[in-house]
Regions:
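A cross-kingdom feature marking solvent-exposed beta-strand/loop segments within repeated
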Residues: 75-79
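Bacterial N-terminal signal peptides that target proteins for export
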Residues: 1-7
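Primarily extracytoplasmic ectodomains and periplasmic/lumenal surface modules that are beta-strand-rich
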Residues: 41-46, 98-100
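Short amphipathic alpha-helical segments
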Residues: 43-70
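Acidic/histidine-rich, surface-exposed loop or edge segments in extracytoplasmic proteins
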Residues: 27-42
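Boundary of Sec targeting at the N-terminus
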Residues: 21-22
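An amphipathic, aromatic/His-enriched active-site/gating alpha helix that lines ligand/cofactor pockets
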Residues: 26, 61-69, 83-85, 91-141
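Bacterial N-terminal signal peptides
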Residues: 7-17
């Protein structure tokens, strides 16, 4: 019993000391997130049109600001099973993990890019109504030549 308390005490006191070192090590490197979109059958083109009109300009603005380094979209060349199907994958390379995870106020940019907020909000709602699912996947590149 005493050994368990000692272990818990050591874990709680030593663990926080290792976290800043890990964060500092990775915070300077680009941070990549893949965003997957699976549209309802027959609505992928409408989703893409709304994405390009109402979301891509916001992403491009963040690239211009330096928050993101690069943004691109991929589409599968061939079909797959329904459970594994996705229609679009947007890959965003953030400047670093800190920038990717800290709060960012997009509202001012949205109001600048889309002064007619009522139309913008209606179209954004429609864009998400067209989806069956959407998921985000942070990824890291593996060095196959290293250890």
């Amino acid at each position: 019993m005493k050994l368990r308390f000692l272990f818990a005490f050591l874990a709680l006191t030593l663990l926080p000391a290792t976290l800043p070192a890990q964060t500092a090590e990775t915070s300077g490197k680009p941070f990549v997130v893949e965003y997957y979109y699976k549209a309802k059958w027959g609505y992928a083109d409408e989703f893409l049109q709304l994405f390009k009109k109402n979301h891509y300009p916001l992403l491009k603005k963040q690239v211009e600001m330096g928050r993101m380094l690069k943004v691109w979209m991929d589409q599968p060349r061939y079909h797959t099973t329904e459970d594994g199907r996705w229609d679009y994958r947007v890959t965003i390379v953030f400047k670093n993990s800190t920038v990717a995870n800290e709060p960012f106020d997009e509202d001012a940019i949205k109001k600048q890019l889309w002064p007619d907020q009522a139309t913008y909000l209606k179209e954004e709602q429609r864009r998400f109504e067209l989806l069956l699912s959407h998921w985000d996947l942070p990824v890291r590149t593996m060095d196959l030549e290293g250890k």
